[in-house]
From Swiss-Prot:
Residues 72-85 have a biased composition (Acidic residues). Signal peptide: none annotated. Keywords: Nucleus, Ribosome biogenesis. The gene is FAF1. Required for pre-rRNA processing and 40S ribosomal subunit assembly. Seems to act in the processing of 35S rRNA at the A(0), A(1), and A(2) cleavage sites. This is Protein FAF1. It is found in: Nucleus, Nucleolus. It comes from the Eukaryota.
Length: 346
């Protein structure tokens, strides 16, 4: 290999390194780097020239002119050089082409972006305008969510207190002096579409009962259940008469519903069904929501029969007897808290 070839190879190597530092290697882009092959071709040429020289020397050796140990060393060195050159040759590998660039699918700009581009404003102004519109939309969404939450709370409150208003309205609210009739008229507000529930417009007995319900609900949340469930002091014979009369009213209500084909909701065992007189007369304040004697019977534990000292544990697979049961029956070892060890005195 001449000096010109060495200079050419060095220049190509420097150019290749500069290109790779700026753009990356050609192999990573899916192309073949031919500058590397030039070096290998030159090396192979040199090695072929060395082989020819060695063959000439070999012919001389056959003639019987020169025979020494140095020739054998040179041959072994040439063989190792040939093996190294064969190993240094690049192996053929499949090309991997990666498309990391933008897609060729055309996405047309929206009408909003077209308008902004036609206006002749800069990109910063356009981005600021877009950010301001997005912030406004987020604020509108937050206000809408807050309004929806407020409406949900008002609806739940109205559903809890609607039975009070309906009970008072059915029970003699046709008179002009009734507070409930005035409440319903004010809640209607002259609209034929429906009643708009507003808390400030509830007046009369309905307002006092609704406020009492809310206070009781808050006290239940805070854990004052016993104070709420505490009954008013009433003589025993009067309370019994009130309970009997209330039970008769409930039976009459259920009978009328059965005759009319109305399916009523189920009530827990021992509790009173809530009807109009329950809310109208506020009877639960005096007699409670259920009969106390039946509640006590329900709360009592069931008798499980005689307590017999049994052995083992019965399962579906049979009787399982533990070592502790065997030791307890045989009496060989003391079983207990201290495992047969005597408690030492201090």
């Amino acid at each position: 290999m001449t000096l010109d070839d060495d200079d050419y190879i060095k220049q190509m190597e420097l150019q290749r390194k500069a290109f790779e530092s700026q753009f990356g290697s050609l192999e990573s882009m899916g192309f073949e780097d031919k500058t590397k092959n030039i070096r290998t071709e030159v090396d192979t040429r040199d090695s072929s020239g060395d082989e020819i020289d060695n063959s000439d020397h070999g012919s001389d050796f056959k003639d019987g002119t020169i025979e020494s140990s140095n020739s054998s060393d040179e041959d072994s060195g040439n063989e190792t050089a040939e093996e190294n050159n064969q190993d240094s040759k690049p192996k053929t590998q499949p090309k991997v082409i990666r498309f990391n660039g933008p897609s060729d699918v055309y996405v047309p700009p929206s009408k909003k972006t077209q308008k902004l581009l036609r206006s002749g404003k800069t990109l910063t102004q356009i981005n600021k305008k877009l950010e301001s519109t997005e912030a406004k939309e987020e604020k509108e969404d937050e206000t809408l969510e807050a309004e929806n939450l407020q409406n949900d709370l008002e609806l739940q409150q109205f559903l809890r207190e609607s039975h009070l208003l309906s009970a008072f309205n059915n029970g003699g609210s046709g008179s002009t002096n009734s507070g409930v009739s005035l409440t319903l008229q004010s809640m209607g507000g002259g609209n034929d579409d429906g009643i708009v529930y507003q808390d400030d417009q509830v007046i009369g007995k309905a307002r006092s009962r609704t406020l009492e319900m809310r206070l009781n609900r808050l006290s239940r949340v805070n854990g004052h259940q016993d104070k709420i469930n505490k009954l008013e002091k009433v003589p025993m014979h009067i309370r019994r008469g009130m309970i009997d009369k209330h039970v008769k009213r409930i039976k009459k209500y259920e009978q009328e519903a059965a005759e009319g084909g109305i399916v009523l909701s189920k009530v827990k065992k021992g509790q009173f069904r809530k009807i109009e007189s329950t809310y109208k007369k506020d009877i639960e304040r005096r007699i409670g929501g259920s009969i106390k004697a039946r509640d006590k019977e329900k709360a009592t534990k069931r008798e499980r029969g005689l307590k017999i000292s049994s052995v083992g544990r019965s399962t579906r697979n049979g009787l399982i007897v533990s070592k502790r049961d065997i030791a307890r029956i045989s009496g060989g070892e003391r079983s207990g808290k201290f495992n047969g060890k005597k408690k030492s005195r201090r």
